[in-house]
Regions:
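Juxtamembrane intracellular "pre-TM" segments in multi-pass secondary transporters
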Residues: 1-8, 183-210
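Helix-loop boundary and gating motifs at the non-cytosolic
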Residues: 6-54, 207, 217-234
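Central cavity-lining transmembrane alpha-helices of secondary-active solute carriers
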Residues: 51-64, 246-255
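Helix-to-loop junctions at the C-terminal end of transmembrane segments
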Residues: 60-72, 255-267, 352
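Structural signature of the two symmetry-related core transmembrane helices
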Residues: 75-89, 270-284
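Paired small-residue
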Residues: 98-106, 293-301
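Cytoplasmic helix-loop-helix junction between adjacent transmembrane helices
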Residues: 103-141
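A late C-terminal transmembrane helix in Major Facilitator Superfamily
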Residues: 324-354
């Protein structure tokens, strides 16, 4: 194999690992109504199941992801896939709230192990094409997250919850066996690689990149918490909800890598700052539009913009990371993103219930613009200081 062929093979295996991990994590969202009907759980119990996965992903990204910078990248991915499979099996065999929370927590931890290591390794395969590689990773992450609920909703009915979770657990096992014989390039390691992620906050360029990724990703928490209810209030149904997720995710799968290729020739921070403007306006439009089919078209357009903005944000993190801290930086970014999504998911339903759709989406749009604006000001100060 030539060097390029090796890099391509490495990337494909990393992408498969990400897809298996993401889909194992997201399939639970297709099972929530089934769990509630079967076990008569309150809404708070469902929130506890879902929230445990987010919390575990956050903690693992902060404290375990830096191990990839010490030569353990492949092991973290393997362990992550193993946890995705184990958690899925526990969920399939469970029959109590405590067991479901345990299974969800284990599956959630798999993201904290797999995602930062894959992102760091993908960017490291060819640093001159890091945004292109990270775009491909972002596309596969979204593809996995969308596929989990879509496929799960199709097979839960005829085959049941147990079979559904076992199938996604089996996919993680297949990915584990496929990547295990492969030798991936190791990440650069220095004496700084022994440190935890937190100390990266002292670096100005890292702070800018973190704030930018927060602006890009925190609205996801609002959409996760509200989207199904929002469309239902407009007269949509479950099929429409699934279709909007599919339409939104399709541009990531098709265009993220190509967008990343263009971003490699530009400033990723500038790309994010420019795209924040139309994204904020589109977010406001959701609160104005009353037709689900029109929202479907807006979602497609937003998906195209986000498929460009996400690789740029990930590339900004990769470029800001010091030598030997690639996975730690990606883990810190992931933890910040999850925290922002958790806050948005907690607050948005309250605003929606009290003030309605327009105020909710307008508030989120203002939040996106304000956070990105803060990052832009900090970036300009960094440029002036560098001169």
């Amino acid at each position: 194999m030539t060097s390029k062929e090796n890099q391509r093979a490495d990337l494909l295996l990393l992408l498969f690992s990400v897809f298996a991990t993401a889909s194992a994590n997201s399939v639970v969202f297709a099972s929530m109504s089934e769990l509630q009907e079967q076990y008569k759980y309150a809404d708070s119990a469902l929130g506890l199941i879902a929230g445990t996965g987010f919390a575990m992903g956050l903690l693992v990204q902060l404290f375990v992801a830096p191990l990839a910078d010490r030569g353990h990248g492949k092991k973290l991915i393997q362990f992550g896939l193993g946890l995705a499979a184990l958690g899925s099996i526990i969920f399939a065999l469970g029959d109590s709230l405590l067991v479901f929370i345990l299974g969800r927590g284990i599956v959630g931890a798999s993201i904290g192990l797999t995602f930062p290591a894959v992102r760091a390794l993908a960017a490291h395969l060819d640093t001159s094409r890091s945004a292109e590689r990270l775009g491909a990773v972002a596309g596969m992450e979204i593809g996995g997250f969308v596929s989990g609920p879509l496929i799960g909703s199709l097979i839960i009915g005829p085959f049941g919850l147990d079979t559904t979770f076992l199938l996604f657990g089996a996919l993680a096992v297949i990915a584990l066996f496929i990547i295990s014989p492969r030798k991936f390039p190791e990440l650069a390691s220095t004496s700084e690689s022994q440190r935890l992620s937190f100390d990266l906050m002292r670096i100005r360029s890292v702070r800018v990149a973190l704030i930018l990724t927060l602006a890009v990703t925190f609205p996801t928490g609002m959409f996760d918490a509200l989207w199904d209810r929002f469309l239902d209030d407009l007269g949509g149904n479950n099929a429409m909800t699934g279709l909007t997720f599919a339409v939104y995710g399709l541009p990531f799968i098709l265009f993220s890598a190509r967008a990343g290729k263009l971003i490699d020739k530009r400033s990723p921070i500038a790309v994010v700052l420019w795209l924040i403007i139309p994204i904020s306006l589109l977010t406001i439009s959701y609160g104005v539009i009353k037709q689900p089919w029109v929202i479907l078209g807006v979602g497609l357009f937003e998906g195209i913009l986000q498929a460009t903005m996400m690789p740029a944000a990930l590339s900004a993190i990769a470029k800001a990371a010091p030598l030997g801290r690639a996975s730690a930086a990606q883990g810190l970014s992931g933890a910040v993103n999850v925290f922002g999504q958790m806050v948005a998911a907690f607050i948005a339903p309250t605003i929606y219930g009290a003030y309605g759709a327009f105020v909710t989406f307008f508030a989120v749009a203002i939040g996106i613009a304000a956070i990105a604006g803060m990052a832009g000001i900090m970036h300009l100060r960094n440029l002036k200081t560098a001169r």
